[in-house]
Amino acid sequence: MTTKKFRMEDVGLSKLKVEKNPKDVKQTEWKSVLPNEVYRVARESGTETPHTGGFNDHFEKGRYVCLCCGSELFNSDAKFWAGCGWPAFSESVGQDANIVRIVDRSHGMHRTEVRCKTCDAHLGHVFNDGPKETTGERYCINSVCMAFEKKD
């Protein structure tokens, strides 16, 4: 089963219909405007089931933005097939301009979590096993945390 690809206008801040700093949005407000799976992953640091994300096999030209707030995260040029079960990118927009890295020692592992710098949504993790010809990094991102804006 593949998860749905959401449009920015259907979820997140745009649905709140108020001008607000994304970091000031209360969890109850996020819960009211995000589908359950998006809320679980983005706001509760969950993980979507591997190989089910709508962007795992998606390779159109464009950009990927945070589903919660619309901040630009990745360009399609940085996307590659990693076979890990989630969309993989070799670099983020502007060298983590809209991403925060956090040490994650949950589940008995040592990883680096990536979150949206604008709204603090959990996006996924970054690993050092990406393509050596680019950055050597692999951003492993949950599809449900992103929207896609096609390049014309």
Curated annotation (Swiss-Prot):
The UniProt record lists the keyword Transport: no
Annotated catalysed reactions: L-methionyl-[protein] + [thioredoxin]-disulfide + H2O = L-methionyl-(R)-S-oxide-[protein] + [thioredoxin]-dithiol
Enzyme Commission number: 1.8.4.12
Active site (catalytic residues): 140
Keywords: Metal-binding, Oxidoreductase, Zinc
Binding site for Zn(2+): 66, 69, 116, 119
GO biological process: protein repair; response to oxidative stress
One Gene Ontology MF term: peptide-methionine (R)-S-oxide reductase activity
Annotated SUPFAM superfamilies: Mss4-like
GO cellular component: cytoplasm
Manner of cofactor binding, per the entry note: Binds 1 zinc ion per subunit.
Superkingdom assignment: Eukaryota
Domain MsrB intervals: 27-151
Gene3D superfamilies hit by this protein: Peptide methionine sulfoxide reductase
Cofactor(s) it depends on: Zn(2+)
UniProt family annotation: Belongs to the MsrB Met sulfoxide reductase family.
Role description: Methionine-sulfoxide reductase that specifically reduces methionine (R)-sulfoxide back to methionine. While in many cases, methionine oxidation is the result of random oxidation following oxidative stress, methionine oxidation is also a post-translational modification that takes place on specific residue.
Protein name per Swiss-Prot or TrEMBL: Probable methionine-R-sulfoxide reductase B
